Structure formats: C-alpha cells, structure tokens
Amino acid sequence: MGKTYSSPINPIPKAPKGLAIHHWLNFLQAAYRLQPGPSEFDFHQLRKFLKLAIKTPVWLNPINYSVLAGLIPKNYPGRVHEIVAILIQETPAREAPPSAPLAEDPQKPPPYPEQAQEASQCLPILHPHGAPAAHRPWQMKDLQAIKQEVSSSAPGSPQFMQTIRLAVQQFDPTAKDLHDLLQYLCSSLVASLHHQQLETLIAQAETQGITGYNPLAGPLRIQANNPNQQGLRKEYQNLWLSAFSALPGNTKDPTWAAILQGPEEPFGSFVERLNVALDNGLPEGTPKDPILRSLAYSNANKECQKLLQARGQTNSPLGEMLRACQTWTPRDKNKILMVQPKKTPPPNQPCFRCGQVGHWSRDCKQPRPPPGPCPVCQDPTHWKRDCPQLKTDTRDSEDLLLDLPCEAPNVRERKNLLRGGGLASPRTILPLIPLSQQKQPTLHIQVSFSNTPPVSVQALLDTGADITVLPACLCPPDSNLQDTTVLGAGGPSTNKFKILPCPVHIHLPFRRQPVTLTACLIDINNQWTILGRDALQQCQSSLYLADQPSKVLPVLAPKLIGLEHLPPPPEVSQFPLNQSASRL
C-alpha cells in the first residue's frame, strides 16, 4: 500500500479547503488507529475524496459519517473505507428526540420537549505512527490562529476540544506552554475554574500512581517539563484537557460573572450577593464552591484584592477570605483644603554679584563673572568662549560667509540656564554661502598634502562637480598621476585632467578641522581650482539661493519707443466694454 508514514517537518497533514480543523482531526485520529499504520498515499487519497465530498454537503451540518460512507465510489483507492468505518464505529448513535405527550385538554398545546445537552468527550491524544511530536514553543501567529478557530465555540465544547487537541498534537507543549495558552484563549473566570479542576485531577492521579512518576522528584507539573519524560508529559496533557469538563457550556459569560464589588461595599455583602446569584443561575450538578471562591477574588475591588494578595489567600477557603477582609472599611474621601507652605522671603543683605537688595544670588540677572583672566588674551572681564581672538574675522568675506539671524542681546540674556548663575550658550555660526548670478561663489582655502605646508588658494564653489579639482602647481613633484576621462559641459575630455590617488587636506575658513579627501582631480593647464561636492558633504553645507527682487520697468509712451508714426487704434464699440452696456 505504499511506504509507511515518514516523519516530515510538520507531522500533521494539512486540512482540505472548506473543512473545519476539528472535523479534519477526527479523520486523522481514525487514520492513526489503523493497523498497520497509514501511508502518505492513504492521506493523499483521503484529502482528494474529501475535496469532492465537500461539493455535496449533504453529510455536513450536522456531520453524518454514514451518509459520507455512501458517497465513496466502489473500489476507491487507499483506505478511505476503513477510516470512515472507524468514525462510524466510535461516533455514538444519535437518538431521535422523544415525541411530545398528548395533552388532556385539546385547547392547551402539549409541552415542548427540551433537548438534552451532549456531554463533551475528550479522547486520548494519538500521534502519527513513526512520527513522534517534537516540542515547539508557541509563537504569536500560532496563538492567533488557535484563538480564531475557537472564537465561536464555548470552552469545553466538542469543537473547542478538537481544536485544542490538534494544537497539543502539533506542538507537544509543556506545562508552562499550556498555562500560557489558557490565559490567552479564556477569560479569568474560566482560567480560574480550569486551574481548580486541574489541581483536583492532578491530586487524584498522584494518589493513584502514574507510570514513571516519582513523588520525591517534585510535583507532576515540574516532572512533565522534563524532555526525557515523554510519558509524564502526555499524562499531564490528558489531565489538562480533561479539566475542561467542569466548565459551563455556553459561549458567553453568564450574568452572575458580571457581579462586581462596589468601591465602598463591604466584602461580606458582596459575597452574599454572589451566593444568591449562583444559587439561582447555576445548572444542577455544577459545583458552586470553586466558582464562588474564584469570583470572590477576581471581582472584588482593588483594596480587598490587595489584602488577599498580601496574606496569600487568593485561592483560600471562603471563610478565611471573609476573615481577612472583614476589617476593611472604605477610606474617607471628603475634600480638604490643601495649605501650601509660605514662600521664603528675600534676604535682607545685598546680592554679592550685583550689590542690590531684594533677591537671592541664584535669581540674579547679572551674568556670572569669570573666575579669572581669559587664558587666551588674559582679559579678566570675559570668559574664554567670548574671547574676540577666537572669533573669525568676517569683515572681508561678508558676502561669502553669512551668519544666521540671531537674537538680540537682551533676549539672549533672559535665556539663562536653570540655576546656572547666568550662564548662556555661545552663538551658533553656520556657513551659508549665497549663489548669485552677479558674482561667482569663491572661497579662500588652504590646501596641503602629506608632509607639505598648507598653501592658500582661491577656489570656486561648484555644486555640480562630483570631485574637487586642484591645479597642477599644487601637486607634489613625485606624485603618481593617473589618466582619466572627465565629462563636462563641453563633452568628454581625456587630456586635461588626471587623478591624484593620495590624501588631500583642505582647510576651510569656517572649520577648525580640515577636510580630508582620499583622491582629487589635477588640472594640467593650471586653470581651475574647484571645490566639489565630496568636500562640501563632509562639512554638512547647504545651498542658499539669495532672493533677488525682480526689476521694475517703467511704462514707455509710443514716442519714446519710436512708434509715433503709427495711426491710433480704431474705436470700435465692444460688449461689454462700450458705455451703453448693462452693468447688472
């Protein structure tokens, strides 16, 4: 029948399109019960048949495997007949609803028979033959896919259990992974009920004895996390799935789950309201004590929850919780008048900085004097940052190097640092070079090579040049020049420029540190000194196009422009330019 089922990366075959995941898991569980085990050919034929059967949905809603068996063609390849037969054998037969008894009075209709709810059945997990599941931690996309599948089903319902079983079979989760999955899928009430039921089942299993369980090695939850204890992990997973049997079977939380303790309500009266609501709302046979304990803590106000957390009684018996919160009383929340402290009066002595009375020295508006003379010019009246010798003389290059508009001195003095004694930040000078049509943008720079002194030269600022160009007279005599082709406005040129592959240092007037270039172009004819974009990019320069007002030309008479010999234009009445036109 083909080779046996191997162990691929994903041991679960993908469900056919249009079939719910929990229904597809039923077919997989039936296939894993075949002896000998199924092959890849059997799964391929099963998916192929289900794709055809979905187009005839007479066996769906509700699913009927007997009708599905009648749709299988005769002599169909694979073991589809055996898989469907196992499903028919393990699925309990649905009894027909009993007919309503006849009423004695013909005027009164007979009572409507209530349908009994089907008990959810959790079967043990069966893994593929020869393909044991490997543990994989949850990812957010996996949790979102599981939550989307069970969003329309209640916790503990058959669809919910089948989807969770498929997730457990695929990922082989540990005890911590199962706890995270429960917190992500269910509400706090359902998680609390499931936790209490799981603790009861674990205590019973530890008492009866489990194969491979050692009481001296810790609880079952700790031993199930051991990767070598695969049997204990499967037992814990089955107990975790069985704990859903005690949950309510409706999709939404009941009305008694929304009962909250008021901010000023005593804890005893809140528990009494919960007790009455559970007596009236719980169905018969549902244990009330675990639900009452869970709601007594989860729906209590913040003050009572803090008291229970501090004493470690979040899951204690109800009597201990009542004794812990019986002394709690709501706090007095009456409004009171807040009296602010009086402001410290100013000192009687004069300020040691300005000599005036009425303020502290930290609030003095006079700048803080320097501690000593300036280390540059030895002037004791200013700080080193304000020394005039450190400022660049911009009188000769006002058209080339412009300063940003700065604030007035009196405005800058008000912007002192907090508790800084009048310290003010120095002025920020940024290079702004205007590009105008009347005057070429030029800069006085200094160029130096390795082990050579800097040489002053006037360079043209060209934002269209990629590489800086230097004349051949500045090039060292022992330089190794390489031929190159330069594409300019006049076309390509091969004999005018050459490349100098050595470091070049360019000193700009507005930078203390020189700009270092790895290579530059050398003009053999000694005509051009161009500062290109490779140098401007290192100094973070920006283009500044100066705004120039447009020229206003006077209106000239015909005599001034030589048109006095032409006849005057004819006067033709036009609409709406004639005088008789309507102005409405």
Curated annotation (Swiss-Prot):
One of its GO terms (molecular function) is nucleic acid binding. One of its GO terms (cellular component) is viral nucleocapsid. One of its GO terms (biological process) is proteolysis. The active site is at D462 (for protease activity). The keyword Ribosomal protein does not apply. SMART domains: ZnF_C2HC (SM00343). SUPFAM superfamilies: Acid proteases, Retroviral matrix proteins, Retrovirus capsid dimerization domain-like, Retrovirus capsid protein, N-terminal core domain, Retrovirus zinc finger-like domains. Residues 457-535 form the Peptidase A2 domain. A motif (PPXY motif) lies at residues 109-112. It comes from the Viruses. Keywords: Aspartyl protease, Capsid protein, Eukaryotic host gene expression shutoff by virus, Eukaryotic host translation shutoff by virus, Host gene expression shutoff by virus, Host-virus interaction, Hydrolase, Lipoprotein, Metal-binding, Myristate, Protease, Repeat, Viral nucleoprotein, Virion, Zinc, Zinc-finger. A zinc finger (CCHC-type) spans 349-366, 372-389. It is an enzyme of class 3 (hydrolase). Residues 95-116 are annotated as: Disordered. Its EC number is 3.4.23.-. The record marks L123, P124, L337, M338, L430, P431, L553, P554, I561, G562 as: Cleavage. Late-budding domains (L domains) are short sequence motifs essential for viral particle release. They can occur individually or in close proximity within structural proteins. They interacts with sorting cellular proteins of the multivesicular body (MVB) pathway. Most of these proteins are class E vacuolar protein sorting factors belonging to ESCRT-I, ESCRT-II or ESCRT-III complexes. Matrix protein p19 targets Gag, Gag-Pro and Gag-Pro-Pol polyproteins to the plasma membrane via a multipartite membrane binding signal, that includes its myristoylated N-terminus. Also mediates nuclear localization of the preintegration complex. Interacts with human TSG101. This interaction is essential for budding and release of viral particles. This is Gag-Pro polyprotein. It comes from Human T-cell leukemia virus 3 (strain 2026ND) (HTLV-3).
